[in-house]
Structures are given as C-alpha cells and as structure tokens.
C-alpha cells in the first residue's frame, strides 16, 4: 500500500513524527514513547485500535526509507535513517528539506510501492494548466475521457484527497478557494525552485530558457 492509498498517512502527520525525531537524542525514540508523545493516552482511551494514524504513518515512513526500526534491549526504537543525506538529517534543515527528501524516496526506481503515486503525479502534471481538472468531479470526468481509469485507479474522492495533499506538499500543485470550494492546479514551480541548485551544481552555470 502506498501513501496514495493510505488516507491515515498524510504529510502533516509524517512531518510531525520527523520533526520530533530531528530534535530527539540520537535522532531516535522508543516506539511506545514516541506514540504516547504524539498521541497521548487520554486521547485514545476506549478506542478499539488505539493509534491507527500513528501506526499507519510509521509503517509508510519505514517502507519508503525515511525511518528505520531497531530492536534495543527488548524494545523497538524508531530512528531517522542514517543513509539520508546529512542536510536531510540536520535539525536546522531537515524539516525544510522534508518535501524533497520524501519526493526522492517515493520516486526512486526501486520503490515499487509508490509507483501508483508516481503515475498519478505524472498524469496530473500533464493536464492543461489553463483548464485543469481542479475538483474530484472534474478529475473523475477527465480520467474517464482519457480512458486512464485502469492505469491510475483513481476511483474515489479519498484517493483524490491524498493526491491533493501529497502533490501539494511536494510542490507539484497548488490550490485556491472559489465559492467556498477548493480547486487545485498542476504547477511544479515550487518543486523546481527548491531543486534548481541541486540540478545545476556547477558554480556560475547559466540556464537558457527558450
């Protein structure tokens, strides 16, 4: 299951977990302590499944390689993956770079779990920016018109909401309100602005726009 199909794993929750661990000693925390810090016991009293959102987010973070789980003294700990770049792990820059870090992890060639997210992002970015499908109803209609339903499997409003959340967080679309309703527009400008310095690393290199 990818973040596209796991509605409990959204950017704000994963960001909250990562921000906590960035400041934690050794960038690690016991799983039980982390769970109770982010989702206090009082809030989950008498719930059939105490912390489904926390568990879903941790699972997705481990699966994509953002975090790892380690056994220590008969307890599990959640740790920021030491294989991430130094800048991604720094307390001063890790939070700001998290959209890039997650995009890199999601779209790496060997991450088959997020293949469907990559397809949806590529499809939405290919839509006409002047007349984009900006609501779930419009997306549903456009998917049917273009006969890509089997490919994208965008079959309900929940999946659309996840697309909106994740593409927006990574800087691949933006949204605005009109008549009390949210509309989205495919636009990777924010993502490109964040990544130009990594794409063109040579000092003084000129970029020609045609």
PLM regions and their residue ranges:
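Donor-sugar nucleotide-binding helix/loop cap in glycosyltransferases
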Residues: 1-210
């Amino acid at each position: 299951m990818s973040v596209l199909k796991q509605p409990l794993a959204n950017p704000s929750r994963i960001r909250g977990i990562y921000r906590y661990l960035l400041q934690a000693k050794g960038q690690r925390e016991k799983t039980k302590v982390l769970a109770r810090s982010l989702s206090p016991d009082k809030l989950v009293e008498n719930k059939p499944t105490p912390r489904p959102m926390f568990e879903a987010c941790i699972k997705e973070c481990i699966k994509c390689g953002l975090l790892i789980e380690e056994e220590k003294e008969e307890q599990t700990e959640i740790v920021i993956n030491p294989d991430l770049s130094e800048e991604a792990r720094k307390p001063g820059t890790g939070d700001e770079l998290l959209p890039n870090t997650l995009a890199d992890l999601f779209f790496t060639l060997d991450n088959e779990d997020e293949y469907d997210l990559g397809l949806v992002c590529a499809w939405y970015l290919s839509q006409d920016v002047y007349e984009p499908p900006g609501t779930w109803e419009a997306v549903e209609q456009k998917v049917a018109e273009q006969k890509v339903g089997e490919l994208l499997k965008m079959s309900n409003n929940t999946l659309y909401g996840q697309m909106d959340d994740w593409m927006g967080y990574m800087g691949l679309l933006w949204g605005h309100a009109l008549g009390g309703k949210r509309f989205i527009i495919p636009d990777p400008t924010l993502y490109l602005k964040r990544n130009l310095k990594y794409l063109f690393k040579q000092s003084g290199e000129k970029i020609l726009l045609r």
